[in-house]
């Protein structure tokens, strides 16, 4: 049996690596860490799956800060193999290697960060794209439907096979540089939530969970979408 369930920390006495997946509140995480430290004498690493909290802040709540790191999976984790591995300033390299080896054994694709940054790797890239997409809609350049269609039918499929820097080298850095020189001045550099999103937040239109967001989800087949 691959999974077993318990409500007692005492049942974790033989555990060496813990993945923490509790709510994104430091006080709650700290209490879990204290219980783990008290009940896991063979502990090698605590890996938080947080999508937002810095490993430095996580480490403040434990006695064994050298064992703490972030191992952030990407949704949906049963389909998408990426796990971002982020250390704090005191994380033991052996702890990182132990977690990385376990993740790779489970078929995960481990992406290492040399130092923490808000949003880690994937969300920083993704939200830069979100910002530009919203800007294009606000400027009347195109609608949400055509942006989504373009992504699904252009570089979305391409980047399942190659990475950004693979593409840079394939296209040629001289060509990439010429495009950037022409394009960068025209890109969005907003540093706050854009009106297109804020107006929907103010109306309570949050997306699928409320039935309406950018799109009207009330008449869509959600089982098919999922």
Protein language model regions, located:
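Structural signal for conserved beta-strand scaffold positions within catalytic alpha/beta enzyme cores
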Residues: 5-7, 69-70, 112, 216
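NAD(P)-dependent Rossmann-like dehydrogenase/reductase catalytic/cofactor-binding core
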Residues: 108, 139, 144-226
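Rossmann-fold dinucleotide-binding core
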Residues: 48-124
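A general structural motif at alpha-helix termini
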Residues: 1, 62, 150-154
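AAA+ ATPase "lid" subdomain C-terminal helix
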Residues: 127, 137-139
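Rossmann-like NAD(P)-binding element
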Residues: 1-46, 53-54
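A general alpha-helix detector
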Residues: 81-82, 129-133, 178-183
